[in-house]
Structures are given as structure tokens and as C-alpha cells.
Amino acid sequence: MKQSKLLMPTLREVPADAEVKSHQLLLKAGFIRPVSAGTFSYLPMAKRVLNKIEQIIREEMDRIDANEMLVPEILPAELWQKSGRYTTYGPNLYKFKNRQDRDFILGPTHEETFTQLMADDIKSYKKLPLVVYQIQPKFRDENRPRFGLLRTREFIMKDAYSFSADQAGLDTAFRNMESAYTNVFDRIGLNYRAIVGDAGAMGGSDSKEFSAPAAAGEDIIAYSDTTDYAANLEMAKDFYERQKPTFSAEPLEKIDTPNEKTIEELSQLLDVPAEKLAKTIMFMADGELVAVVTTGDFEVNDVKVQNFLQADTLELAEEGQVKALIGASFGSLGPVKLPENVRLLVDERAADLVNFAAGANEDGKHYLNINWQRDVQLTEENIGDFRTAREGDVAVDGHGHLVFTKGIEIGHIFKLGTRYSKAMGAQVLDENGRQVDMIMGSYGIGVSRLLSAIVEQKADDDGLVWPASVAPFDVHIVPVNTKDDEQAGVASQLEELLTKQGLEVLIDDRKERAGVKFADADLIGLPIRITVGKKASEDVVEVKVRASNTNIEMRVSEVVDSVSVLLNGDK
């Protein structure tokens, strides 16, 4: 393709509102343009990359016998009301009415739609297992879109769903999809980790997240420095063995703490380390007030709390609400003498505290020498891991220490079980003639997000660097002087030879200075650049490998074989 015919409006300056490298370079190189906050147009170069990513996905889905199809992006509210997510999904769900005053949504994901389809059309276990998928835009009304394609209101996603008659079928589908995702990301050329993830609004019993380490990542990944353990910080666990301390219980004592509102202040007053103190955080979980107690040196992990409670919604309680019920403000809360309608959860580290201090549920008062069972009844069913892991802690497997890094979520796979099939009535007759709920899995890849993830990992100071497997073109031919007949002839000859080999070629036929052409070539980052310059008369050109920035002079007759080898080495 001739570059003069390509819509690729490059910029010389980086837009001021572009915060991260991928946003800056995709704008500067003419790959994307903003339409509104969180929505973008994908220009021809970006669309070519997306097409190649999608083709890799399709090939890997074909390997596991997944069926590609397409369902509507506009969905009737009744579908989501059946599952309960119409109210629990939260403010990120786009809702609207049509002219007949019927409620609709723009789909952020499609569990309900596919499950209803299966409920209507699949009645026997003999038709299972089935895996279906689609690649289409999704919509999420993000409060604050940012970082270019990393957090948007409209995004392209591949979402897949498996339907099985039993747990073994789900386990097989999950393993197959995990293998397929590994192949996809390997072929794209990304550095990534498969980590323990949170199922979140999707629900389900098990999930695994694929994360690409990058400075622009909004997720924090915790991994062991000596083993394969890795998890999203929301799910990360540190190593802890429950203690059975031998101790002498001291008398419970209430003291005045008029100026001590934080763990740090209380620690200083009592000359006691934070890990020997307890702090209490109040949450509202599905309308129920829940008190969560951890040791003072840890933060409460709300995701772990929500998963433990299996709550649809969890948010920090409002201070006025807490004071009206308990009689104390934040900073003076504790586990002793809580009202009966407040559920108590205690982190396992806090459950092993003895003679510890905590708020007395009176403003300006704290208890000393609290002991479980004597002062607060505590059962094992209310003890768990409710803390956020810290960098440097021993990893949960007891080997190595946790290291934190930022990551971009690029894929996620879930074992949903029967959450949606029960709600949507998706049942089949099993081999014994009994009606059973289909057992489901849900699997997603952020297709448009992959554009940014690739750029974040691969780009250098000069611009984009596309892996050969997804590059918009394979080869960039740059004649230094288009008015020179010999250069133009060699460039045309190379274009023809390379195209016959099945390679996609972009030829810079613009009447621009050589420096401008070279800068643009580095900026758009095609894998191979062939510069046709003064040595064209000698049938010699310069081949540049963009990823390594190495230059090789070679004869025109050597170019086709050499370029093929160089490209295959990058795929």
C-alpha cells in the first residue's frame, strides 16, 4: 500500500491530556482519535492490528472447537433482572428506555444473553458440552475514563461461554480455554502472568486472570520471588499459621483516649506495636452492617470480605449511620459489646491476639486487655483472611517473599457454576433422565486493551514497536528520494517481490525529507524497514529490524529470503 493513500495523521507533539505511553504514542502515530471521554475511533493502522489480534484469537478458538457467533449489544432489561445484575452491577451499567418506554441496557458482558439462548434451545446433555464466543464492542459507564484504551466506556472484547452437564465438563472447558489464552498471548508476543483473580460482579467459584506487567497498569500483582505463586493484590495471600498462645488474661480496662483516632496515635500512646492492636472497619453488605477486625498493621481487604460473605454489594458504612447504631465515631470502634444486629468478622491474625487494645465503641475511649471468648464471643466460622497482603511478606506457600508490580488485565477466565443457569432456567435432561442445571464458564479477552498492553511493553524512545504477528504491515519500504528513478524502481521491485511472498508492504511514496520519513517510520514501528538510498544504483539497500534497531546492508536479491527469516524469528 502507498503511504500517501493511507489515513495515518501523525502528530509532532504529544497531546497534553495523554497520561501514559500507549495513549501518547497511539495518538501521535495516527492509530486512534478520541470522539468523547472514553470512546475512540480506530484508524486504519489500529484496525489492521485489531484484525490480526482477532484472527489469532479465532484460530485458537477453532483449536478448542469453540463456536463463533454474535448477539445484540442492546439488551432488554428483563434478562438482567432475571439474574439480579440489573440492580447489583452498579452505576457502570448503561441503562435507557426506548420510545415504547421499555427498559434496555448496553451490554458490558453477555452471560445472561447466551444462557437464555441455551435455555431456549438445548434440552439434553447429549448436546453438551458447548463453547460459544463472540468478538464485539462492550459498554461500561466508567466514572473516570483514563489512560487511553486502558479504561474506556466502549471497548472491544472477546467473550466466550462454556456450557456443560457436569463439573468435569466445566473443568475440561476451563483448562482448554486457559491453554488457548496462553497460546494467544504467546503468539502476540506479550510478557504476561497467569494469576489468581477475583470473580467480582461475574460471580463464580474460581477465576484466573492474565496480566501484562506494565508501568501503566492499574492492577497490582503480588508474586513470590522464588515460586510460581502470583495473584491480583485483591486476592493475594501471605503466609500465616494460626497460633495457640499460652497467656495470663489481664483485667479488662477502659481508658480515655480523647486525642487518639488512628492506630499510629494509639500505638504511640500505649507504646505497643501496631500488630498487637486491633482495628475495626464497618461495612454495609447487602444492607447488613458488618464489623471487620484486623491487626493494626494491616489494611482490610474489602474484596476478600465481600467474597467471604458472598454479598452482591459491599461498601464502607457511613459514619453517621454507624454512630446512630453503635454510639461511636470511626476511630473509637471495637469488637466489644457490639449490637446483636452487627455481624462480626475477624482476621485470623487478629483472632490470635491476646490482652489487646481496641476501641470501646464510645468516642474518646479504648479498652485494654481484650481477650476473645471472655470479652467477645468468636466462632471459627467468622474467622478468615480479611487483610491486604504486603510487599515483603512471606508468600502463602511459605516459600519466598511477595513482590509487587503493576499489571494490565488482558484476559480473565471464570468458573461460574450454576449462578446464571439457575436464574435463567437453563436445564438439560441428564443421562438418568433428571433435570439438571447447566454448569457454566465465562472467558474474556480485552481485544482493544491489548493494543495498549503491547505498546506499553514494546515501545521505545523512538515510537511504537509492533511484534510481527500483529503488525499492521510486515515491511516498510522507504525510498529516500522518490524523484530518483533508480530508487523508485528498486522500491517498486522490492514491493512486488515481497508481496508475492505473501507479505504486507507499506511503501512511503510521500515527497517528504528523508529525516521526516525515518522519524515517521520509527514512530509507527513496523517490524522491518527497507531504506532505498544512494546505493540503489548498486542494487544495495539497508534493512532495519525495528525491535533491535539493527541495520544490515544487503543486495536486493537477498532481501526476500532475509526478511522472511527476520520476520519468522519475531513471530
From Swiss-Prot:
Superkingdom per UniProt: Bacteria
Gene3D superfamilies per record: Anticodon-binding domain, Bira Bifunctional Protein, Domain 2, YbaK/aminoacyl-tRNA synthetase-associated domain
Enzyme class: ligase
Localization annotation: Cytoplasm
Keyword list, A-Z: Aminoacyl-tRNA synthetase, ATP-binding, Cytoplasm, Ligase, Nucleotide-binding, Protein biosynthesis
One annotated GO molecular function: catalytic activity, acting on a protein
Pfam families cross-referenced by the UniProt entry: HGTP_anticodon, tRNA-synt_2b, tRNA_edit
Catalytic activity, as annotated: tRNA(Pro) + L-proline + ATP = L-prolyl-tRNA(Pro) + AMP + diphosphate
Cystine connections: none
Subunit and partners: Homodimer.
Similarity comment text for this entry: Belongs to the class-II aminoacyl-tRNA synthetase family. ProS type 1 subfamily.
Record PANTHER family: MITOCHONDRIAL RIBOSOME PROTEIN L39/PROLYL-TRNA LIGASE FAMILY MEMBER (PTHR42753), PROLINE--TRNA LIGASE (PTHR42753:SF2)
Cited function: Catalyzes the attachment of proline to tRNA(Pro) in a two-step reaction: proline is first activated by ATP to form Pro-AMP and then transferred to the acceptor end of tRNA(Pro). As ProRS can inadvertently accommodate and process non-cognate amino acids such as alanine and cysteine, to avoid such errors it has two additional distinct editing activities against alanine. One activity is designated as 'pretransfer' editing and involves the tRNA(Pro)-independent hydrolysis of activated Ala-AMP.
Domain notes: Consists of three domains: the N-terminal catalytic domain, the editing domain and the C-terminal anticodon-binding domain.
Protein name, entry field: Proline--tRNA ligase
